[in-house]
Amino acid sequence: MSEAKNLLVERTYRATVQELWDLWTTKDGFESWWGPEGFRVEVHEMDARVGGTLRYDMIADAPEMIAAMEKMGQPLSHKTRGTFSQLEPQRRLTLTHVIDFLPGVEPYESTMVMELFPSGANVRMVVQLSPMHNPEMSRMQLEGFTSQLGKLEKRFGAAVSAST
């Protein structure tokens, strides 16, 4: 596994802590924003408690993404599973995904830690992403995650953004 440092993504939204928390911990919330632009998810299981399981399909649904996936010889959807390993309601969660859908790459775990910090009418969301198996995949991970955050910016409006 890569010795690269964790990636840090921070956004501040004009939303409530409960609204953002529900996006991470409910089926409807998760399906409403998870996945980069051009993709959607279908949640099959979400048990948002310590040790609980998250299972979903990531599905290319925009014509340009479908064409790109087909051109690369990649499937249009893949099954994803993870485990909630830490939950402090409306404050912090840790979600560990099993990365077992990359051709030619041994399965491994990728962890993300999400924290919420209320500030007046806004909430700052800080997400720490563990690096993927190589720098290029880590770059793509950050790009994809940043893309899906655009869905939240459209929904709530973003006050301030930062990534490292």
Explain the meaning of each model-derived region.
Residues 1-41, 45:
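Hydrophobic ligand-binding cavity/cleft-lining segments
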Residues 3, 48, 73-78, 104-108, ...:
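A generic structural micro-feature
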Residues 8, 41, 77-81, 107-112:
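Short, surface-exposed coil-to-beta transition loops
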Residues 20, 30, 54-56, 84, ...:
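Hydrophobic pocket/interface hotspot
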Residues 42-96:
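Glycine-rich portal/gate segments that line the openings of hydrophobic small-molecule binding cavities
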Residues 85-86, 92-146:
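Beta-strand/loop substructures that line and gate deep hydrophobic ligand-binding cavities in soluble
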Residues 154-164:
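Short, highly charged C-terminal tails/helix-capping segments
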